């Protein structure tokens, strides 16, 4: 069968790569894809992004189903458009995707359904926001209401930082429409984890646990990014935390969306903060697989992903199970110079073949020129995954592979997965 994956990042490379491993799959088209999906066996890039063009392509090629990678097409209603055209697609509707595309919608939803999260208020007026911050004190968290590519969250450790973030979003319009409203919430302490599940509207199939590294620099310093590395499984998600996250967060969310008259289908990602007592709180929802978490998680999935997605689209997730490798996977992101602000593009990347002999290199911000050179073409350029019998082995494999790669201005963290090693 022929499938379609929408997106051009490392997450989409990993999803398409995993789907293509199924003996039932002939070709996975990736729209628009990158330099990695262009050369991966059984994958083929197509240069289409408009919903109607993609719908016509699916009809012409008899695509069995489509998987949506990134958040922007979901927020733009691609699932609604495909379903209206009678095509099978895995992802949430535009309404359900508001769990990610509007922080205010998500927080109000959590309040209504008693899903544990930080206390918050929403503001459009800068003066009122400044007053609230002065009253609450720091540390405090300022979030753009809309989609900001994972960079719309400022964890302000001082009041000055909080006031500056409010001014950037509400007065200086630095986030555009995404920051025209801000959610200000209490700072939660603990350890973060990514809890990702597949949902068919009623049934839930958990994916492997993982932990992301959001900050640019070692020791969780520097600017927030889309994610600089991840590992799976995440030891902080103990069996007790796992049960609590399912029962207190995931299942009430799925039931709540159904009660609202908008069943949630697709990947649901709860960003968790786990406090010292083991209580999980929801920091954010994403309505798609995480990036870079997808890369290590897919590296551990032994099941046929196409079977799982088909079951989910057909409302039969309760009839399948996901089998995971007992190994640990560590993924390290290689980012361009000046990421996350003004990443440099167009530099030649060398050493990819040598790195792929040691680990698995997933492409994100890459493109190829006429000569076949792979060039940097985005902020996060590559994610290198290593597998091992324990976290230390997997980390060594990932960094061993990564050391073969070079491009001008390449930056990466050297401490990915250390939290798990040091536990």
From Swiss-Prot:
Designated gene of the protein: purD
Entries under Gene3D superfamilies matching the protein: 3.40.50.20, ATP-grasp fold, A domain, ATP-grasp fold, B domain, Phosphoribosylglycinamide synthetase, C-terminal domain
Pathway: Purine metabolism; IMP biosynthesis via de novo pathway; N(1)-(5-phospho-D-ribosyl)glycinamide from 5-phospho-alpha-D-ribose 1-diphosphate: step 2/2
InterPro entries per record: ATP-grasp (IPR011761), ATP_grasp_subdomain_1 (IPR013815), PreATP-grasp_dom_sf (IPR016185), PRibGlycinamid_synth_ATP-grasp (IPR020561), PRibGlycinamide_synth (IPR000115), PRibGlycinamide_synth_C-dom (IPR020560), PRibGlycinamide_synth_C_sf (IPR037123), PRibGlycinamide_synth_CS (IPR020559)
Main EC class the enzyme belongs to: ligase
Pfam family, one: GARS_C
PANTHER family per UniProt: PHOSPHORIBOSYLAMINE--GLYCINE LIGASE (PTHR43472), PHOSPHORIBOSYLAMINE--GLYCINE LIGASE, CHLOROPLASTIC (PTHR43472:SF1)
Protein residues bound to ATP: 133-194
Keywords (A to Z) from UniProt: ATP-binding, Ligase, Magnesium, Manganese, Metal-binding, Nucleotide-binding, Purine biosynthesis
Catalytic reaction list: 5-phospho-beta-D-ribosylamine + glycine + ATP = N(1)-(5-phospho-beta-D-ribosyl)glycinamide + ADP + phosphate + H(+)
Protein source organism: Neisseria meningitidis serogroup B (strain ATCC BAA-335 / MC58)
Protein name: Phosphoribosylamine--glycine ligase
Segments forming domain ATP-grasp: 107-314
GO molecular function: ATP binding; metal ion binding; phosphoribosylamine-glycine ligase activity
């Amino acid at each position: 069968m022929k499938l379609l994956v929408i997106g051009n990042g490392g997450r989409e490379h990993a999803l398409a790569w995993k789907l293509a491993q199924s003996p039932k799959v002939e070709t996975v088209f990736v729209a628009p894809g990158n330099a990695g999906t262009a050369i991966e066996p059984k994958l083929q890039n197509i240069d289409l992004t408009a919903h109607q063009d993609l719908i016509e392509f699916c009809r012409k090629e008899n695509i069995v189903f489509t998987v949506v990678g990134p958040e922007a097409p979901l927020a733009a209603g691609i699932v609604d458009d495909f379903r209206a055209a009678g095509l099978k697609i895995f992802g949430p509707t535009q309404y359900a995707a508001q769990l990610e595309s509007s922080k205010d919608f998500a927080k109000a939803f959590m309040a209504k359904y008693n899903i544990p999260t930080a206390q918050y208020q929403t503001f459009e007026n800068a003066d009122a926001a400044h007053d609230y911050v002065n009253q609450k004190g720091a540390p405090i968290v300022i979030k753009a209401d809309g989609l900001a590519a994972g960079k719309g969250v400022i964890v302000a450790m001082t009041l000055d930082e909080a006031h500056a973030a409010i001014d950037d979003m509400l007065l200086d319009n630095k986030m555009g429409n995404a920051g025209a409203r801000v959610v200000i919430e209490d700072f939660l302490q603990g350890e973060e984890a990514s809890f990702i599940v597949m949902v068919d509207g009623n049934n839930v199939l958990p994916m492997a646990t993982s932990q992301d590294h959001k900050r640019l620099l070692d020791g969780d310093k520097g600017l927030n990014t889309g994610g600089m590395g991840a590992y799976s499984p995440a030891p902080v998600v103990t069996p007790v935390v796992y049960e609590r996250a399912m029962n207190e967060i995931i299942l009430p969310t799925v039931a709540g969306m159904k009660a609202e008259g908008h069943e949630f289908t697709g990947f649901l990602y709860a960003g968790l903060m786990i406090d010292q007592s083991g209580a999980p709180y929801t920091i954010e929802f994403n309505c798609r697989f995480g990036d870079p978490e997808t890369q290590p998680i897919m590296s551990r999935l032994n099941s046929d992903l196409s079977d799982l997605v088909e079951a989910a689209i057909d409302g039969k997730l309760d009839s399948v199970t996901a089998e995971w490798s007992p190994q640990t996977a560590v993924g390290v992101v290689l980012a361009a110079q000046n990421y996350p602000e003004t990443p440099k593009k167009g530099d030649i990347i060398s050493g990819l073949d040598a790195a792929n002999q040691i680990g698995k290199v997933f492409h994100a911000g890459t493109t190829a020129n006429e000569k076949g050179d792979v060039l940097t073409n985005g902020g996060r350029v590559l994610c290198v995954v290593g597998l091992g019998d324990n976290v230390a082995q997997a980390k060594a494999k990932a960094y061993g592979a990564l050391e073969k790669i070079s491009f001008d201005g390449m930056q990466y963290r050297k401490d990915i997965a250390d939290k798990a090693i040091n536990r």
